[in-house]
Amino acid sequence: MIETKKKSAGWVWLIIGAALVLAALGAKPAWYAWLDLSFYWTERTEAELTVKAYAEEQGISIGEYPRSLIELLERNPETQDFVLNYPFREAAEVDLSGYESSDTVPLFLQWDPQWGYEKYGSDFLAITGCGPTCLAMAGYYLTGDENMTPGQIARFAEKNGYYESGYGSSWKLISEGAGKLGLTATELPLVKKKMVDALEAGKPIILAMGPGDFTTTGHYILLTGVEDGAFRVNDPNSVENSQRLWSYEEIEGQIRNIWAIEIG
C-alpha cells in the first residue's frame, strides 16, 4: 500500500515536471499544461471528452474553456457549437434583422454568440441570462425596439440591482424593471383561462419556473400563444423545448409566478 502511494506520487511529480517544462518552452501556460497532461486520470463526461477532442484538433488546451461552459454542455447538448467556439469568440455587432416579424414572438437563446459570452452576474449570460432573455423577447416583439436585446437587458438588470448573487435575476426584473423599459408587467393568478385570455389579447407571458421539465433549480420561460388548447413556449435555453406544445397540466405544478407583458 505504501509502495503504491509512492509510485502514484512519483507519477504526479513527473507530470508536474512535464507541465513546467512545456510552460518553460512557451508551449502553453503551466496550468493549461497540467490540465492537459492530467486529463485522463479520472473518468470523464461526454461533454469533457467532446471539448478535449475539439481542443486537440484546434491545437489549444482544454484549460482555455471555463468549467461553467463545459457544465453547460453537459446539461444541454444544444449548446455544443457555442461552447466549442468559446476560445475563438469575437465581439460582433448584434443583428436582429432575422427576427423581424410583427406577428411572431422571436425566440432569443441566451447562448446565442451575439450576447451569450457576455458576463451577467456571476457567470456568462448563456448560463445566468434567462430572465433578461425572456424580457428581451417580449419587449422586442411588442415594441420593435432593437435595443431590446438580452445583452442590453442584462446590463440594465445589473445597473438597477435586479441580479441577486447566488440566485440570478430577481422577480423584480419583471415586476418592476419592465415598467422602466416602457412595458407593463401584470401579475396573473395560476388560472388557465386568465393565461389564455392574456395570450389571445396579444400579451406574451413570462413564467418563473421551479424544478421540472425546464430546470433543476430556477428558470424563466415565455409563453407566446395558444394552439389546440396547449401553450406555445419560447424557452431561452432550448430550441427543442420551444418546438413543441405544452399543456397546462404539464407546466402547472412547475410555475412559481406569472406576468402578462404589454406596452406601458
Listing of model-derived features with the role each one plays in the protein:
Residues 12-13, 17, 24-162:
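Active-site-adjacent structural segments surrounding the nucleophilic cysteine of cysteine proteases
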